[in-house]
Amino acid sequence: MGKNIFFEQKGPFFLGELFTALQFKKKIKIFDIRNLQQATNRDLTFFDHINYISLAKSTKAAYCITTARLKDYLPKTCVPILVKNVIFELCRVTRQFYPNADIDSPDLTLKNSKKIKISKVKFGNNVLIGKKSKIGKNSIIGSNTIIEHDVIIGDNCTIGSQVVLRNSLIGNNVVIQDGCKIGLKGFGFIPL
């Protein structure tokens, strides 16, 4: 996974800024929060379930949010940050790096598809497309559909009518039925 194209990132942060209740010997800068597999020695990661032991053992992360029960699976190069609830702390820290990621703001860059030149794509009526969106060849987009900024749709896709696509990377040969909303905020929760 490369750079996050959907959300503005803040940081870097000192580790002590992210975990104010903990004491750290050094002033270490953390540049991003990533999963176990993609984290680098400049990143923070998280490890919350034994299903990810193999990934934990090979992570390149500098620090890892985890529990006392799982810490021994991390490599010596990764310092465990012990917490009671990994998912809660992950959400709290992620919000510092990506403070607007949980807000569904309207896309003010939308333009009518008739004003945008995309070859080999068929559009229904009243289709709106955001800035830097890409639609693959031989795709069909139904009427009254909104494709927000930075969304990428592959080749040979059929997107139904009254669909909203946000924060999404859609592969090739995908069919999305009428009325679907993909990439919008759902009914998430943080277990306490």
Where are these regions (language model features)?
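Terminal amphipathic alpha-helical/low-complexity segments used for targeting or macromolecular assembly
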Residues: 1-114, 173, 179-180, 184-192
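Structural signal for interior beta-strand "rungs" in well-ordered beta-sheet cores
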Residues: 46, 110-192
